[in-house]
Amino acid sequence: MIEFSNFYQLIAKNHLSHWLETLPAQVAAWQREQLHGKFKQWSNAVEFLPEMTPYKLDLLHSVTAESEEPLSDGQLLRLDKLMRNLMPWRKGPFSLYGLNIDTEWRSDWKWDRVLPHLSDLTGRTILDVGCGSGYHMWRMIGAGAHLAVGIDPMQLFLCQFEAVRKLLGNDQRAHLLPLGIEQLPALAAFDTVFSMGVLYHRRSPLEHLWQLKDQLVNGGELVLETLVIEGDENAVLVPGDRYAQMRNVYFIPSALALKNWLEKCGFVDVRIADVCVTSTEEQRRTEWLTTESLAEFLDPNDSTKTIEGYPAPMRAVLIATKP
């Protein structure tokens, strides 16, 4: 069973200690009542992985761990098999002792777009909301963060994160909790909060922005990345049943409308840092995700539209400050 005691001990000694008033009971309830039917299969894969300490570790330019001596064919095959038990792998890529996990998303491309616009992460305590497998948390650590805490209710992501952590020498600088943002008290304890690829899944996007603000210290920085459409400050798309085959997409504003939303929620120094169309090179089917991906979600005769006829996915990065 995946344990969270190391995280509890860690925050007991720092400015997150007040979280211990609610967090252990929430996690215990999750372990008791909410485990996915495949959770034991996934957690067994993590348990059977060897705990390895990298001879070389690069989290600044990638997530790459290397051993002093190459793994044997048998060791590499076993590693490959255990990590494939945790498919599908959506967020990465990871290069672990000669095993290259080519994930659906080139999350490194997103990080390269975001990083130049951030305040220096050195020494910061960071919250990553909807963190997926935790890829970006490792990159945050590589960029100098003191502690990265991720939350994501998807239990496969938790197991993927713990698998990677185990192969990175049980690194305790990043932690993933199986929670949603709505389960967090207003901690006001994080120097930087990331919400990337979450807002359009929220039925109440302004409430989500308030929840993110509640987690930041005064003067803290929000990094918001989400789907947007072209248009002025009043433009918002509310898709019908599906958008790019996703059922749970509620609001897709223009970047200018999103800037207004952030200002309405009391953020200051709001700026649109980047806008780019998602390509089928950045999100695609691989041997680590064998189901449909972006190419199948677009109109086969017009790649500027989704299969439903909406504008194809375009994503913006906005940076804002809590005063």
UniProtKB/Swiss-Prot annotation:
NCBIfam families: PRK15068.1, tRNA 5-methoxyuridine(34)/uridine 5-oxyacetic acid(34) synthase CmoB. InterPro entries: CmoB, Mo5U34_MeTrfas-like, SAM-dependent_MTases_sf. It catalyses: carboxy-S-adenosyl-L-methionine + 5-hydroxyuridine(34) in tRNA = 5-carboxymethoxyuridine(34) in tRNA + S-adenosyl-L-homocysteine + H(+). GO terms for molecular function: methyltransferase activity; transferase activity, transferring alkyl or aryl (other than methyl) groups. Belongs to the class I-like SAM-binding methyltransferase superfamily. CmoB family. Keywords: Transferase, tRNA processing. Its EC number is 2.5.1.-. PANTHER family: METHYLTRANSFERASE, TRNA U34 CARBOXYMETHYLTRANSFERASE. This is tRNA U34 carboxymethyltransferase. Catalyzes carboxymethyl transfer from carboxy-S-adenosyl-L-methionine (Cx-SAM) to 5-hydroxyuridine (ho5U) to form 5-carboxymethoxyuridine (cmo5U) at position 34 in tRNAs. Homotetramer. The lineage of its organism: Bacteria, Pseudomonadati, Pseudomonadota, Gammaproteobacteria, Enterobacterales. Carboxy-S-adenosyl-L-methionine binds at residues 91, 105, 110, 130, 181-182, 196, 200, 315. The keyword Transferase applies. One of its GO terms (biological process) is tRNA wobble uridine modification.
